Curated annotation (Swiss-Prot):
Keyword Cell wall biogenesis/degradation: no
Protein name (database record): Hypoxanthine/guanine phosphoribosyltransferase
The protein's annotated pathway: Purine metabolism; IMP biosynthesis via salvage pathway; IMP from hypoxanthine: step 1/1
Keyword Ribonucleoprotein included in the entry's annotation: no
Transmembrane annotation, as ranges: none
Organism lineage string: Archaea, Methanobacteriati, Methanobacteriota, Methanomada group, Methanococci
Entry's EC annotation: 2.4.2.8
Signal peptide: none
């Protein structure tokens, strides 16, 4: 039986932005429709891959939030969202982020030295967001136990490994053509 994530990816609309084929999917964009069965599939598959003996789940805004919420509700592990705006809280860790399409700052709050954490995110493409999250967690003194991204596209996984030394698990690896999403690997 096909997984809900795989089915919805294969039916994703494709838009062209310059030379880039961009897929529109609820996990990455929140549209066209984010169903409970899709979120349940993603959360269940992620939980099966992680060590749940952790203190916190960490994600970056925005589309990692529903994933972290679903995992948190299923495991009773609290989660922290790295935000794009500064809150000026004590212990806040700022870090610069560069992705394939944007640059900016991310701010980590709510993680203490020695916290065991798992990072979850929606899409891994260039690795820029994930590298920034890892750097912030290292600055905070957290122990990164697992990293799971739902969708892998591009060379970000190898870039994250090369720059940070961390392995990233993904649920699906895709390619996007003008004809649609091609699932290269489904875990």
């Amino acid at each position: 039986m096909k997984k809900v994530l795989d089915e919805t990816l294969e039916s994703s609309p494709i838009i062209k932005r310059g030379e880039y084929n961009y897929f529109i999917h609820p996990i990455a964009d929140g549209v066209p429709l984010f169903t409970s069965d899709l979120l349940r599939d993603v959360a269940t598959r992620t939980i099966q891959r992680i060590d749940t003996n952790i203190d916190k789940i960490v994600t970056a805004e925005a589309m990692g939030i529903p994933i972290a919420t679903a995992i948190s509700m299923s495991t009773d592990i609290p989660y922290v969202v790295m935000r794009k705006r500064q809150y000026f809280l004590e212990g806040e860790v700022p870090v610069h982020q560069e992705t394939g399409y944007s640059k900016g700052e991310l701010y980590l709050n709510g993680v203490e030295k020695g916290d065991r954490v798992t990072i979850v995110d929606d899409v891994l493409s260039t690795g820029g967001t994930l590298i920034a999250v890892i750097k912030a967690l290292e600055k905070a003194g957290a122990e990164i136990v697992d990293i799971v991204c739902v969708i892998e596209r591009g060379d970000g996984k190898s870039k994250v490994k090369e720059i940070t030394g961390y392995d990233v698990q993904t649920l699906v690896k895709i390619d996007v053509t003008e004809n649609g999403v091609v699932i290269l690997e489904s875990n």
